């Protein structure tokens, strides 16, 4: 899980999701997991 100032899609399988006021990226590739904060 990477914590970034701006979470964005890396590949076309990445999905931007908002959970508990945080923006998350989930993907089939575990390296692409990110959180904004």
UniProtKB/Swiss-Prot annotation:
Any Gene Ontology biological process: translation
GO molecular function: structural constituent of ribosome
Main subcellular location of this protein, as a coarse class: plastid
Keywords: Chloroplast, Plastid, Ribonucleoprotein, Ribosomal protein
Cell location: Plastid, Chloroplast
Any single GO CC term annotated in Swiss-Prot or TrEMBL for this entry: chloroplast
A Pfam match: Ribosomal_L36
Keyword Cytoplasm recorded: no
Protein family: Belongs to the bacterial ribosomal protein bL36 family.
HAMAP family associated with the record: Ribosomal_bL36 (MF_00251)
Name this protein carries in UniProt: Large ribosomal subunit protein bL36c
Organism: Piper cenocladum (Ant piper)
Lineage, uppermost ranks: Eukaryota, Viridiplantae, Streptophyta, Embryophyta, Tracheophyta
Gene name linked to the record: rpl36
């Amino acid at each position: 899980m990477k914590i970034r100032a701006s979470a964005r899609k890396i590949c076309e399988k990445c999905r931007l999701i908002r959970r508990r006021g945080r923006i998350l990226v989930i993907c089939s590739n575990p390296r692409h997991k990110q959180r904004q904060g």
